[in-house]
């Protein structure tokens, strides 16, 4: 699978839809999937989904025949509050999943409800992906649930405002890749948002096996800095599936001894 990592510069009070649409159109015939950062549309008020912006993304995805994992939208559901929701759009321009962010930042908890549903989706007739926005990546139980449902590729969206925090997030990314023997595509926030300057740092890692058939070191195949750019990585999901058949940290399951 060829995946485009789109690290857009997003400023809080600017409009970015045209940049998003141009990125998707440019990716046509080059990639299978385009991934955007968490706050990819800027600061917008909650509204019912799909919004006009999301509808425009759907149409361009259809014309480009490419899958898209959006950053969070502010999904207003009358009678049920607002959620931070990542839309997964297929090559036909259809929304195949609406994945609600579960682990909210303290400031987000004042305005949004935490999701309780699935954090995975299926693309191209059977390729499972897990989508983890913000702190969801740090919740081992959420990642494990997505993998158990069939996620073969983990997509994370994060916002780091210092080199130290970026290194912390990258450590978590590598841990998830090693734990589940699955590649992780992590798209970093770039630009001034919420009064902070986010430094990008988009990262892609993949697990490896040693000659003895046990997990080796995680390989970092992309490590962006603070540039606004789109990079394409190619991931052999069949090879990682075979790797998981040969070894698993969860098989056999641990059974506590009776006291």
Language-model features and meaning:
Residues 9-16, 129-134:
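Active-site mouth loops of central-metabolism enzymes
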Residues 34, 127-133, 155-156, 185:
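Short hydrophobic-aromatic micro-motifs
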Residues 70-72, 84-88, 119-120, 201-204, ...:
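Short beta-strand scaffold segments in enzyme catalytic cores
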Residues 78-152, 162-175, 242, 248-249:
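Active-site catalytic loop in hydrolytic enzyme cores
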Residues 235-259:
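A short C-terminal boundary segment appended to hydrolase-like catalytic domains
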């Amino acid at each position: 699978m060829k995946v485009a990592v789109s690290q857009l510069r997003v400023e809080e009070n600017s409009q970015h839809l045209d940049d998003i649409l141009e990125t998707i159109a440019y990716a046509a015939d080059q990639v299978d999937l385009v991934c955007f950062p968490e706050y990819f549309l800027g600061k917008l008020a909650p509204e019912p989904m799909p919004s006009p912006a999301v509808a425009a993304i759907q149409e361009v995805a259809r014309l480009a025949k490419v899958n898209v994992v959006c950053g969070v939208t502010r999904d207003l559901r009358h009678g049920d509050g607002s959620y931070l929701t990542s839309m997964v759009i297929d090559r036909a321009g259809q929304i195949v999943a609406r994945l609600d962010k579960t682990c909210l930042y303290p400031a987000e908890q004042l305005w949004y409800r935490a999701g309780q549903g699935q954090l995975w989706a299926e693309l191209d007739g059977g390729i499972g992906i897990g989508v983890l926005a913000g702190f969801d990546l740090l919740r081992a139980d959420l990642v494990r649930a997505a993998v158990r449902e069939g996620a073969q590729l983990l997509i994370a969206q994060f916002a780091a405002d210092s080199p130290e925090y970026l290194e912390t997030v990258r450590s978590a990314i590598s841990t998830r890749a090693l734990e589940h023997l699955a590649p992780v595509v992590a798209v970093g926030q770039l630009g001034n948002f919420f009064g902070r300057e986010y430094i990008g740092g988009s990262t892609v890692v993949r697990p490896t096996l040693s000659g003895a058939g046990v997990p080796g070191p995680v390989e970092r195949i992309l490590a962006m800095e603070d540039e606004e750019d789109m990079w394409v990585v190619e991931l052999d999901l069949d090879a990682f599936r075979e790797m998981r058949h040969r070894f698993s940290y969860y098989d056999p399951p641990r059974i506590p001894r009776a006291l």
